[in-house]
Amino acid sequence: MKSKFLSVTIVILSCVLMIILSSCNRINTDEDRFFVDNDNRLRMIDIKKNGPDIVVPEKVGDKVIRIIYLEDSYFSKIDSIDVSNVSELEYFTLELWGGGSYSKLKRLDFRKNKKLRDVTVNRTKALEEIIFNKNCETVCLFNTYIKELDLKLLKKLNHFTYWHGPLESIDLSNNTNLDQVWIKNANIKTVDIKKLKKLKSIVFYGVPLEELDISNNPNLVAVRTYNTNVKVLDVSNNPKLKFIEVDEGTEIIGETNAEIKYWTKEDIERLEEKSKDN
């Protein structure tokens, strides 16, 4: 009788132990905390199971992470995200939409992501610092709190966008591969683009820029500088220009066949109102 009771007890204990081990294994499995689709794109992180300080693994199951694409206000719950283990990372996108004002994320570090080419960040209102890897080709920053950027090592950078933030200065002198520079609603008063001979398109909107020298940018196709303090634009050395947009009253020096649009104060006001609605 005792032997039978002992056997039953052993079986029960074994079952309980298996359940406990299975539960622990399930909780600690990356597949249970991270979702990677068939395109090797990380699209979901279970913050409840991970906690607010995220460490992204190199792979989940047999899927190596090449893209991080987090687009939802849900991700505003992330306080920090460590991607240093993701050695094959090529694209990083973080879009918080309406949750951006609640975000506590202050820093992103991509120094160990040697294959990373594209960084896009939007509505991370607390974000103060980004450290890039030298191979980055595209940087798009919208609605951040970044005041300073160090892009000196980004020799391959060809597209730079910064919208809606307190950026006060930008040094692009080492980024000679740039063909697009778009800056809107920032605090930049001066910018030097003399060394950017490959530059094709520039946008400066809503910045206190007082002058813009494009005399050394022969490949420019589009210049849009309005809602600024620029009063004179010399296009004498820009034979490829097709589009020019400036504030009403801006003096354009030099002959050009480009299509010219003059923005009035009323135009700017309507544009600002439309932006608020969106």
Residue map of PLM features:
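N-terminal capping/linker segments that flank leucine-rich repeat
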Residues: 2-98, 103-118, 123-125, 132-137, ...
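Short hydrophobic transmembrane-like helices used for membrane targeting/insertion
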Residues: 10-12, 19-20, 146, 188, ...
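Compositionally biased, intrinsically disordered low-complexity segments enriched
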Residues: 23, 115, 161-166, 182
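Conserved hydrophobic beta-strand positions in leucine-rich repeat
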Residues: 68-70, 81, 92-95, 108, ...
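Canonical position 11/12 of the leucine-rich repeat
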Residues: 75-79, 102-106, 125-128, 145-147, ...
